[in-house]
């Protein structure tokens, strides 16, 4: 029983360790080769940034809400001018209400257009009635 068996032989136990270390080295080499390629792919994707383009129409019809927002922004941009205007108005004796009235507070262009179109439509109706009666008499 004192004879060395394959499992108890020191050299044979060392040989599997050597083969394992050799396999480990071989496995490390392909990993090292793959690592630079992966890093190159990552840098290639970062070289091309994503660009978003947004176009806005200038001739687009503006809603009344947007118009009021734009005017409020204009007022907030130049608070110094507004204060100067108020200071001049007080020295002249005029009220601030007259100066504070801007295009947004008074009747807007759209309102005036609506009023004029309503008036013209009423006139057209009146004219249409008189014309209609004359046309009816002409057809008989």
UniProtKB/Swiss-Prot annotation:
Residues 1-20, 62-79, 131-140 have a biased composition (Polar residues). Pfam families: SPAN-X (PF07458). InterPro entries: SPAN-X_fam (IPR010007). Residues 1-140 are annotated as: Disordered. It comes from the Eukaryota. Belongs to the SPAN-X family. This is Sperm protein associated with the nucleus on the X chromosome N3.
């Amino acid at each position: 029983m004192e004879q060395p068996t394959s499992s108890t032989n020191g050299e044979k136990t060392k040989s599997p360790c050597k083969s394992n270390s050799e396999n480990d080295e071989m496995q490390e080499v392909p990993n090292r080769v793959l690592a630079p390629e992966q890093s190159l792919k990552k840098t290639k994707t970062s070289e091309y940034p994503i660009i978003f383009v947004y176009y806005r129409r200038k001739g687009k019809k503006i809603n009344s809400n947007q118009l009021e927002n734009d005017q409020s922004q204009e007022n907030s941009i130049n608070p110094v001018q507004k204060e100067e205007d108020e200071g001049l108005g007080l020295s002249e004796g005029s009220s601030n209400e007259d100066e504070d009235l801007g295009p947004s507070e008074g009747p807007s262009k759209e309102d005036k257009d609506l009023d004029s179109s309503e008036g013209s439509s009423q006139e057209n109706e009146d004219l249409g009635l008189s014309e209609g009666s004359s046309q009816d008499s002409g057809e008989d």
